[in-house]
């Protein structure tokens, strides 16, 4: 594993810290290491939730390493499994990822956060997609994911002028889940992770699968699709041991013991 990436396992929760002073910028080598970490997380049955954060208090990630670019790394270089930053092109991840944004999330750093399922950010965090000012475009998900979250006028301003969005504005638009003090950031992310661990893993996998499959469908069509039998996790969860355990635990006034089957 890259020395720029620190992995910590806390039971079923994996913490990934990007630590590349001064700005946690990501070159191809680092992106490959991040992809390996996220794919291992995906495939490890003991892990339930991942938290991705940046080292230090100023930068979550400044995105693509422009020093590497100046030395010849192309914008369309091979950034490894999972695409840029290891997560932006993993489309079959059935476990939740939390981005704990500790500072500036610019360019590919913002795109990395957008690829997560939840964003918890510090009060000093801000978000921007400045690629157009560098002669490129935010094609690691920014130009695709942001329009699903914001009105066109706001998206256009952000992607065409590179203007920054504060943590509080991001909260108002619903891009982030929580804004907390810098000192509370990781505790808040871990609290959310534990809440996710308390939910049944098969149910979460089914939810993510349904979101992916039906997000562009009308509601009626979505109903038909999820009941068509083509999905993997949704039919499984309906007939799982966990589907019996949940109501049983509720009736017995105890915490459920999920088996993931």
Curated annotation (Swiss-Prot):
MF GO annotations: hydro-lyase activity; L-carnitine CoA-transferase activity
Note the InterPro entries from the entry.
Carnitinyl_CoA_dehydratase, ClpP/crotonase-like_dom_sf, Enoyl-CoA_hyd/isom_CS, Enoyl-CoA_hydra/iso, Enoyl-CoA_hydra_C
List, from the UniProt record, the residues annotated as the active site of this protein.
111, 131
SUPFAM superfamilies per the record? Answer: ClpP/crotonase
What catalytic activity is recorded?
Answer: (R)-carnitinyl-CoA = crotonobetainyl-CoA + H2O
Q: Which family does it belong to?
A: Belongs to the enoyl-CoA hydratase/isomerase family.
Please give the NCBIfam families that the UniProt record associates with this protein. PRK03580.1
Name of the protein this chain belongs to: Carnitinyl-CoA dehydratase
Q: Which organism is it from?
A: Salmonella paratyphi A (strain AKU_12601)
**What lineage does UniProt assign to this protein's organism?**
Bacteria, Pseudomonadati, Pseudomonadota, Gammaproteobacteria, Enterobacterales
- Gene that codes for this? caiD
């Amino acid at each position: 594993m890259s020395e720029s990436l620190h992995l910590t396992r806390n039971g079923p929760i994996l913490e990934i810290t990007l630590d590349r002073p001064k700005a946690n910028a990501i070159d191809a080598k680092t992106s490959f290491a991040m992809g390996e970490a996220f794919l291992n997380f995906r495939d490890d049955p003991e892990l339930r939730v991942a938290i991705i954060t940046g080292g230090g208090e100023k930068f979550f990630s400044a995105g693509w390493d422009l020093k590497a670019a100046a030395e010849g790394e192309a914008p369309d270089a091979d950034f490894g499994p999972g695409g840029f930053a290891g997560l932006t092109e993993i489309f079959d991840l059935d476990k939740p990822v939390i981005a704990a944004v500790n500072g500036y999330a610019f360019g590919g750093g913002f795109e990395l956060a957008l690829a997560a399922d939840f964003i918890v950010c510090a009060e000093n965090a801000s978000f921007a997609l400045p690629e157009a000012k560098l002669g490129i475009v935010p094609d690691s998900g920014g130009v695709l994911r942001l329009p699903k979250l914001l009105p066109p006028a706001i998206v256009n301003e952000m992607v065409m002028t590179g203007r920054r969005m504060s943590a509080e504005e991001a909260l108002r638009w619903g891009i982030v889940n929580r804004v907390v003090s810098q000192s509370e950031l990781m505790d808040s992310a871990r609290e959310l992770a534990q809440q996710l661990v308390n939910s049944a893993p098969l149910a979460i996998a089914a939810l993510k699968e349904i979101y992916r499959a039906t997000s562009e469908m009308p509601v009626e069509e979505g109903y038909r699709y999820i009941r068509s039998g083509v999905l993997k996790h949704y039919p499984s969860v309906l007939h799982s041991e966990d589907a019996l355990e949940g109501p049983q635990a509720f009736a017995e006034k105890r915490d459920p013991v999920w088996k993931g089957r």
